[in-house]
Amino acid sequence: MRTAMSCGGGLVQRLDFSSSDEEDGLSNGINEGPQKGSPVSSWRTNNCPFPITPQRNERELSPTQELSPSSDYSPDPSVGAECPGTPLHYSTWKKLKLCDTPYTPKSLLYKTLPSPGSRVHCRGQRLLRFVAGTGAELDDPSLVNINPFTPESYRQTHFQPNGKRKERPEDDCRTDRQMKYAEKEHPAVFQSKRFVLRETNMGSRYKTEFLEIEKIGAGEFGSVFKCIKRLDGCFYAIKRSKKPLAGSTDEQLALREVYAHAVLGHHPHVVRYYSAWAEDDHMIIQNEYCNGGSLQDLIVDNNKEGQFVLEQELKEILLQVSMGLKYIHGSGLVHMDIKPSNIFICRKQTELGQEESDGEDDLSSGSVLYKIGDLGHVTSILNPQVEEGDSRFLANEILQEDYSQLPKADIFALGLTIALAAGAAPLPCNEDSWHHIRKGNLPHVPQLLTPIFLALLKLLVHPDPVMRPPAASLAKNSVLRRCVGKAAQLQKQLNVEKFKTAMLERELKAAKLAQTSGKDECSDLPPMSGFSCRGRKRLVGAKNTRSLSFTCGGY
């Protein structure tokens, strides 16, 4: 390709480029430039009408900008008489697009690569997306919440350097050095930063992973939806807050529920927790779906039909919920909001021939399970931060800010819950009727209950929290577990029969041993006329036999 340029009406230079010179120009052309004080510099300053381009250091050039004409190119001396000529500066050639070659394979490949700090976004709905970049926000270890419900011993074990539980007194100096070093190496442990909801926002995981079926509940915190997870096809209960929680006073309540679920884990009488996340500053919690609704729904349906839960089913509810409370209290937590709307029902079909055991852990094999849910008011027994729940089920000592018997507040609320399921009128929120119940008076139950069960319910609402039975005692109460006494009796009889069987086996073994030893002695004796050792019989006459008797006279 040949190109000519004019300078002041005269021909300045004829440029000749060939394909073979293109690659050579990448390495040789950079060092060819006009020197300061040379005739070329005076020509560029005084005679040439083209704009003057400042000189640039060759170190500032990127690999894609190291493009210049061939080094074996020299100006025409015949033209230099009118206008001293020289090859144009590389920036001028780049503007004229004479030396830029962006279509080489190397340059095309370089332009297709993303920059180190860029993000690549994929179009379309895809569950997995590649996002390039440093990811400093996600990799920052200081943005980690500390669960307040984690046992103190567990927290100390996992949050101290080297996992040591206890240091010896003589190692105090070394311990201080280790702590300072650990603070430098692991600042997230010693200078933890609260991971607020706004920092956990992501794309709409709810719409991507779940298919909303219907709304199944609503409360003060938010709404609950029945959803199907697209991946596994199972039903889940998705709880979403009504309003944004980031930065609000309700944020701690939302996080408290997540903390409690994570610590409690899985128990057959506690609603199972799967995951939690934030979208648009709204907290979303994925829990187990209970197909039987709540106990409050059952009570409402019974009131419409003029029915109520019978005593046998009341005992089953009280037993299973007390077992859930036993697990929660054993974990060092209290629920603080036990009521019918927070007790959920799971109905499942039992297979034919499936035997149900009377053990505590085997109650999960029944056809109906009662589970405790809504852990938004859960607090620690040792370090209580009480957030009062429903005032209709609130114990009087909690109102007086006496937190010495926190687990017994759940027992009080459970007693009133069973009374409502038995057909009692709705509970008052205040006034004299509210205080009347706090004096140990059980609400009136329209159905006839057995005296022993009625006495147990009155004990649950006793004004003195010390007199109320703990959840562990309720889970083993003989009134609730009718088969406990019978099972103990049957177990005792079984042990007696096992002992008798063992004695008979010993006697049988001794008899067999004696019979074997008798045969050996008989074989060692010399043969006697008239006796047969095989049958131990006596021959009389020709072929007649008579049994041999060793009995003595007089006996």
From Swiss-Prot:
GO terms for biological process: cell division; meiotic cell cycle; mitotic DNA replication checkpoint signaling; peptidyl-tyrosine phosphorylation; regulation of meiosis I; regulation of mitotic nuclear division. ATP binds at residues 216-224, 239. The modification Phosphoserine is found at residue 549. Residues 1-81, 149-175 are annotated as: Disordered. One of its GO terms (molecular function) is ATP binding. It catalyses: L-tyrosyl-[protein] + ATP = O-phospho-L-tyrosyl-[protein] + ADP + H(+). Signal peptide: none annotated. Residues 68-78 have a biased composition (Low complexity). Its EC number is 2.7.10.2. One of its GO terms (cellular component) is cytoplasm. Belongs to the protein kinase superfamily. Ser/Thr protein kinase family. WEE1 subfamily. This is Wee1-like protein kinase 2-A. It comes from Xenopus laevis.
